[in-house]
From Swiss-Prot:
Keyword check for Endoplasmic reticulum: yes
Spans within the Lumenal topological domain: 77-97
Protein name per UniProt: Probable gamma-secretase subunit PEN-2
Intramembrane segments: 21-39
Cross-referenced InterPro entries: Gamma_Secretase_Asp_P_PEN2 (IPR019379)
Keywords (A to Z) from UniProt: Cell membrane, Endoplasmic reticulum, Golgi apparatus, Membrane, Notch signaling pathway, Transmembrane, Transmembrane helix
Subunit organization: The functional gamma-secretase complex is composed of at least four polypeptides: a presenilin homodimer, nicastrin, aph1 and psenen.
An individual GO BP term: Notch signaling pathway
Compartments (UniProt record): Endoplasmic reticulum membrane; Golgi apparatus, Golgi stack membrane; Cell membrane; Membrane
Its job: Essential subunit of the gamma-secretase complex, an endoprotease complex that catalyzes the intramembrane cleavage of integral membrane proteins such as Notch receptors. The gamma-secretase complex plays a role in Notch and Wnt signaling cascades and regulation of downstream processes via its role in processing key regulatory proteins.
Length: 97
């Protein structure tokens, strides 16, 4: 467990933590959804159905967002030079060369 109090989490506290992490993940922070899933792994045998719902959709959100992001990164890295000025315009940093 992460902290000694974790052994004493009741269902209401678990639901509250899972819900907060799930909502925080919507602010373009999909890694928070992953943390939500990893945090509750030790409790997986005793989870409430509501917590399982948040964890299931955290996993779906994390995988979906990561797939879209990695797909975009692949397309961008392969085609940036072909796009010319547009490829440079959408860059955060413009590489030299």
């Amino acid at each position: 467990m992460l902290i000694p109090e974790d052994d004493k989490l009741d269902d209401e506290k678990m639901i509250n933590i899972a819900k907060k992490l799930w909502f925080i993940g919507f602010f373009f922070l999909p890694w928070v959804w992953l943390i939500n899933i990893l945090y509750f792994i030790p409790y997986r045998n005793s989870l409430n159905d509501k917590v399982k719902w948040y964890l299931k959709f955290s996993l779906i959100g994390f995988l979906g967002y990561s797939t879209i992001f990695m797909g975009w990164m692949g397309i961008y890295l392969v085609n940036r030079n072909k796009w010319g000025a547009f490829g440079d315009d959408i860059s955060i940093t413009i590489p030299f060369g």
